[in-house]
């Protein structure tokens, strides 16, 4: 197991340098898997860039994946049984149901939830809570600290009520896309795809706590982990091992 960082300003060629290295190594080590993890919006473009750069007929041992696709790929490989995954649309529908059921317990937000886009905003907030490991107990602390700001405290109380109602509704029936990474983390050691592989993380400005936990576990399973890091303009682009 090794961890490497490639530092450089935006546009300095970090990705190009790493991709060239990965393609060369993939050709020299056909029995090793190379996984490049990028944000969702960059997967297609990264695949296209690699194919254009490749001087072979294909790149069979290189996979370009998002965190979500990595989760699907590995859980399918190891046969982990999981509950249906609730996507953003599903979350919004569940929240609409929960909000209707709990309307009397939502003095600050109850009359606003029918407005266009409001459920979407609540869903986004709850998604971030789950990504960053914020529990209803953590929200109690936020509510306490906001007591002197009456309107904010009331909205936080309502948001906590919706968050708890959402969790109660999906418990034992669904998992969210955020939770799939924790399911994946517990299954990594069973994966033959990941064992001895090289994993690259490129294009990220940072990682959530759930993603950090996954990366830590990946480092125990994979042979090598490489992370590109954007730094300020004017600083040297260095590759640290």
Predicted regions and their residues:
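Accessory N-terminal region flanking or inserted into the helicase ATPase core
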Residues: 2-6, 10, 14, 101-203, ...
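Histidine-anchored nucleotide/phosphate-binding helix
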Residues: 22-24, 208-221
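Glycine-rich P-loop/Walker A and Walker A-like loops and their local beta1-loop-alpha1 context
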Residues: 3-29, 33-47
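Conserved helicase core region in the C-terminal RecA-like lobe
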Residues: 63-70, 198-207, 211, 226
């Amino acid at each position: 197991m090794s961890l490497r960082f490639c530092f450089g300003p935006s546009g300095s060629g970090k990705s190009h340098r790493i991709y060239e290295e990965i393609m060369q190594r993939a050709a020299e080590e056909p029995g090793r898997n190379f996984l490049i993890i990028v944000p969702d919006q960059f997967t297609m473009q990264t695949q296209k860039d690699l194919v254009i750069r490749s001087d072979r007929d294909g790149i069979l041992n290189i996979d370009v994946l998002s965190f979500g696709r990595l989760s699907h790929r590995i859980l399918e490989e190891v046969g982990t049984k999981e509950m249906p995954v609730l996507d953003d649309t599903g979350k919004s529908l569940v929240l609409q149901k929960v909000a209707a059921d709990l309307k009397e317990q939502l003095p600050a937000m109850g009359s606003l939830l029918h407005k266009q886009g409001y459920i979407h905003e609540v869903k986004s907030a709850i998604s971030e809570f789950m990504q960053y490991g914020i529990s209803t107990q953590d929200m109690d602390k936020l509510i306490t600290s906001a007591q002197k700001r009456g309107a904010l405290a009331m909205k936080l109380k309502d948001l906590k009520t919706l968050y708890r109602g959402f969790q109660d509704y999906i418990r034992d029936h669904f998992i969210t896309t955020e939770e799939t990474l924790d399911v994946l983390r517990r299954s990594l050691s069973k994966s033959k795809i990941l064992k001895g592989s090289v994993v690259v993380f490129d294009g990220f400005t940072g990682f959530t706590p759930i993603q950090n936990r996954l990366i830590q576990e990946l480092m125990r399973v994979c042979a090598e982990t490489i992370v590109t890091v954007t730094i300020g303009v004017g600083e040297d682009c260095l590759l640290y091992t």
